[in-house]
């Protein structure tokens, strides 16, 4: 496990518009936007020197009160990152966040190992627990076990690249002597944890390489960093370094 920056530090990026259309955030022009517009935003972010673009993840948005602020357009993160990766050169490609419980960890390892292989290791696997209970129900996944599923998924994805054939025996997933490839050339896939509370901060310290603040104010950062470091120490990771993936909001200058 390793941070992207040698000593750990802040990286700045944005979740491009268009690929996700929550009602509260989408602007009218996005309704008619095309993949070419999405690409233009990503290439502009690269030209401006941003560190990453981030693509969100929802699979089956329910028609209920909780999800009433969500539309049904959410581009698949793996397909979208692959497409953007083929049309950019240096900007990193982040899932922000992949809801780990929705996919078997071997599938996640295969998808993101392939992305890393195809994009000169520009991929960051950002993972989270998820929050839309109706979506879990639609997929037949126990919403109340999402934290445990996330923890085991992180461990299993890391382990998938440890050798040519690997085995895993956990409470949620079990398999023996299977190979996953291609793997990242370095043998390591950066994994960032996203979330808005102390559970995500502690999970970062115990298992992650970086943290994605989601809705955190700047004055919370000292507490977040202290919690990550304490959790890392308690997990025997005192020497670990961590990145922070910061996504400021965007502002339009002129017409989109």
Feature locations, PLM:
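N-terminal beta1-alpha1-beta2 module of alpha/beta enzyme domains
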Residues: 1-87, 189
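Internal, glycine-rich beta/alpha segment that forms the wall or movable "lid"
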Residues: 2-8, 63-67, 82, 95, ...
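Conserved beta-strand positions in the central sheet of alpha/beta enzyme cores
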Residues: 13, 54, 126, 212-213
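Active-site mouth loops of central-metabolism enzymes
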Residues: 18-36, 96-106, 185-196, 247-256
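Acidic-and-aromatic substrate-binding clefts and catalytic sites of carbohydrate-active enzymes
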Residues: 62, 71-73, 100-106, 215-223, ...
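Glycine-enriched alpha-helix->loop->beta-strand junction motifs that scaffold or abut catalytic
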Residues: 87-90, 119, 205-212
